[in-house]
């Protein structure tokens, strides 16, 4: 499997279970690209929604994608600390067009003090019925929520001290 090259600018595409495009993040710079992990950075980029709306992110962010985990993170650097928006979704794929994953609705927001909140359970329940998520998928996603919470408590991966700050310093070299 090929993977995005360090320093290259890519798009990130999220899809829904039914195969429809959900969201596109533009102009994201790859800081580390391997077959197992992609770390990327962006700042005030355009995000295109499937319904045609566009919006711009408000702050710099470090993005973390894992080829073996059913979650990814957007680590937002704000004046009062780092906020983490964790998406439950498939492990990433890379196909030269974009880094891609399927978004499965559930999210965990983590605050600078490492408190967290599980979001969008109602959206998950609705989409699981509408798009007929198989029972095996529910098992995988529930286990992934537990694994993600474990990472947060253990300060693993992007939650480790200095992880985001160190990658942000690398990102600034490419801006």
From Swiss-Prot:
Q: Belongs to which family?
A: Belongs to the Ntdp family.
Q: Where is the secretion signal located?
A: none
Keyword Magnesium tagged: yes
Active site feature: 23 (proton donor)
Cofactor(s) of this protein: Mg(2+)
Protein name (Swiss-Prot/TrEMBL): Nucleoside triphosphate/diphosphate phosphatase
Give, as one word, the top-level EC class.
hydrolase
Catalytic activity, as annotated: a ribonucleoside 5'-triphosphate + H2O = a ribonucleoside 5'-diphosphate + phosphate + H(+); a ribonucleoside 5'-diphosphate + H2O = a ribonucleoside 5'-phosphate + phosphate + H(+)
Q: Which NCBIfam families match?
A: PRK13662.1
- What is an example of a GO molecular function annotated in this UniProt entry? magnesium ion binding
EC numbers for this chain: 3.6.1.15, 3.6.1.6
Q: Which UniProt keywords apply?
A: Hydrolase, Magnesium, Metal-binding
Give the residues the record marks as binding Mg(2+) 2: 105, 107, 120, 123
The record's section on HAMAP family has:
Ntdp (MF_01568)
- Native species of this protein? Shouchella clausii (strain KSM-K16) (Alkalihalobacillus clausii)
Q: Pfam families under this entry?
A: DUF402 (PF04167)
